[in-house]
Amino acid sequence: MLVAGRYRLISAIGRGGMGEVWRATDEVLGRAVAVKLLLGEHADESATARFRLEAQTAARLSHPHLVAVFDFGAWENRLFLVMELVEGRSLADLLLAQERLGPEQAARIAGQAAAGLAAAHRQGIVHRDIKPGNLMLDGEGTVKIGDFGIAQFVDDPSAALTTTGHIVGTSLYLAPERALGRTADAASDMYSLGCVVYQLLLGDPPFRSDTATATLYQHVDTPPVPLRQRGVDVSAAFDTYLLGLLAKQPEDRPTAQQVADWFQGDAWRGRPEPLPPHHPAPALAPFPAAPAAPAPLPGA
């Protein structure tokens, strides 16, 4: 099947609530791409607006840790989005296969994901649905954040595309302020990332209950249990910093750039800062000898 006279669909990759994603070939440039098609039965006004928003959002972003978007348009009464093809798997797939990760791998993923979010936040874009399924790892293990379908431009409240009081996002990773129906901001993304990193290390997110509503109450009211108390072998520094990401108040969480810098350094290892190199102080010059007392005058 040839979309828009250019993109030849090869095989289906996945299907979500709004559309289906295909592996395809761009026959003009001769490269592999991913093509997302809006499903016809879901092409109502709201879904169409969200699909357009994803394209507009991605067009404002260019960063190694964000899935790039190359093209957008309409074809046979369906909208399509052409994206970078990430040859790899999502963190959700990785967790299914591996259950939990070690601190070093989790720190690398956290640092790269935070760097991608920092780029989005600098453009005034909040993702609003950070979860393992939206964090991809390419063949080299590099993080790529995808699916900006419910993103929000913080300078354009009309871009929320949700009815009043309707919460969008995934309950396991939803920030407390979002659970209370407040507007998402950059700090909300950081809380969600904290939930993901917690799950990478433990195998379970910090909060999980029998119902989505009960889980939301936990995000609002229940302090997260430190990982070290749950038997996870991480440094005290890592554990404490992660609890900061999971702070109940948005203003108490670090920014995306701060998180990226922290995890891309060695602070998460919990090692003491090295002392500055020792340079012996130069020897003090000897004091000059006191001048001899003058000889007494004759007859004095």
What name fits each language-model region?
Residues 37-60:
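AlphaC helix of the eukaryotic protein kinase fold
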Residues 76-90, 94, 98:
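Conserved short submotifs of the Hanks-type protein kinase catalytic core
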